Amino acid sequence: MKITVLGAGVVGTAAAYYLAADGHEVTVIERHAAPARGTSQSNAGLVSPGDATAWASPAALKTFLRGLYNHDLGIKVRLRFDPYFLAWSLRFLRQCTVARLRANSQVKLRLALYSRDCINAISADTGIHYDERKKGILYFFRSQHSLNTGTDNYRYLAEHGLPIEIVGRDRLVELEPGLAGVKEKIAGGVYSPIDQTGDSRLFVDNLAAYASEKLGVKFLFGTTVEGLDIQGDRVRAVMTSAGPVTGDAVVISMGPESGLLGRRYGIDLPVYPVKGYTATIPLEDESKGPTIGGADEDQLMAYSRLGNRLRLASTAEFTGFDRTHKPSDFTTMFRTARDLFPGAFDEKKAELWAGLRPMMPGSVPVIGQARYKNLYLDTGHGHVGWTMACGSGKFLADLVAGRKPEIDPQGLVYGG
C-alpha cells in the first residue's frame, strides 16, 4: 500500500520505518525542515519503562491545585479561557482513581518494555547510534516520606514485569558516584537496570536517513498538513501546503497537534499539549557529572548523560500551545542540577528549549484505525514518547498488516 504518515518525530519516523520494512510505499509529511525538530527535539533523553506510572492518580488533584499558585513546583497551571483544556481536565480527573491508575500504568509498562526491545533491535539491525547508554536509571527521593510513598508505584510496576532494586544511600552512590556529594540529602531510591538513555533527535535523524536510503521512505520536509480530503468512509488525500498527497492509508502522528486535526473530522482524540523545559549543557568536568540517567523525584527533574553533554528536563506546564521560554523558566532546574553535580557544568553555555508533550487524560497513547477505514492513529504518548515510539510503530505495522501484535493490545487500540 501507499501510506502517508503525518509527522516526522520519533513516533512518526518509527512508524514509517516499520511500515516500509513491511514493503509499503511510505511518504512522511513534516512541517519542519528536518525530522525530530518538534516534540522529539530535546526531551529528557530517558528510555524509561521505570517511568511508566500514569500521571493521573488520586494525588493528582492536590498537585494540580498547588500548581496554580506555586510556580517553583514541577507542575504549573496557567489559568486561561480554554474550553478544550477544561474538557480534557475533567477526563483527566476521571482517570484519577486507584483502579484507573493501576490499569493505565500496566498498559504503559507493557508497551514501554516492548518498545525498549524494539529500539535495541533497530539499533542492531541498522547500525545506528544515538549517544546511547544502557546502564539503567536511578529514581531517587530526598525524604523518607516521599521514598515510602514513591516506591509503592515502582513495586506495582515490578509486580507486572519491571526489574527494580530498592536502594539505600550507599548503594545509590555505588551506582552513581556523581551523587556522592549529596548522599546525605537523599533518603534512597529505585534502580531500574533495564532502563537506558539516548539522544532521541540523533536517533530519529539517523533512522530517517536509513529509512530513506535503504527502505525508500520519502520525506516531505517544510510541508504543512492543511486538512484531509474525505470521501465517504475513506481519506482520499492529505491536503498540504505543497498540494494533495494521495495514498491508500494515512497515519496521524502529529504530536500535540494530532487532536486538533482529529477533531476537525469527528475523531474523539483528547490529546492536550503539556509544556516541558530542557537544557543541554556541555560537561566542563566529566568526572563530576552523572554516569547514568536519573530523576530527582522530589524536585521533579530528570537528567541524562548524552556523550559529553548533560541533558536536564523539568516542568509540566499547562499553557496551551505556547512554546516560548525565558531564562527564569530554568532557574529551579539549574539550582537543582548544581546541588546534585557541583562543578560539572557551566549553565551559561546551556542550550535552552521548550516543547510540548502530547498528553492523553490517562497517559496511555492511542494506536489503530479510527472512524475512517484507512485512517490510523499513533499518538498521545505524553512524557514517554521516546520510550514508547518504536514499540508503537511496530504495533501499528502489525495492525495495518492484519497480523496479531506481539503484545496484548488491550488498552492500546483506539476505540473512539
UniProtKB/Swiss-Prot annotation:
SUPFAM superfamilies from the UniProt entry: FAD-linked reductases, C-terminal domain, FAD/NAD(P)-binding domain
A GO MF label: D-amino-acid dehydrogenase activity
Disulfide bond found in the keyword field: no
One Pfam family of this chain: DAO
EC class name: oxidoreductase
Cofactor: FAD
Binding site for FAD: 3-17
Superkingdom of this protein's organism: Bacteria
GO cellular component terms, semicolon-separated: cytoplasm; plasma membrane
Keyword match Flavoprotein: yes
Keywords from the named record: FAD, Flavoprotein, Oxidoreductase
Enzyme Commission number, as recorded: 1.4.99.-
Role: Oxidative deamination of D-amino acids.
NCBIfam families reported in the protein's UniProt record: PRK00711.1
Protein name: D-amino acid dehydrogenase 2
Organism of origin: Mesorhizobium japonicum (strain LMG 29417 / CECT 9101 / MAFF 303099)
Gene from which this protein is expressed: dadA2
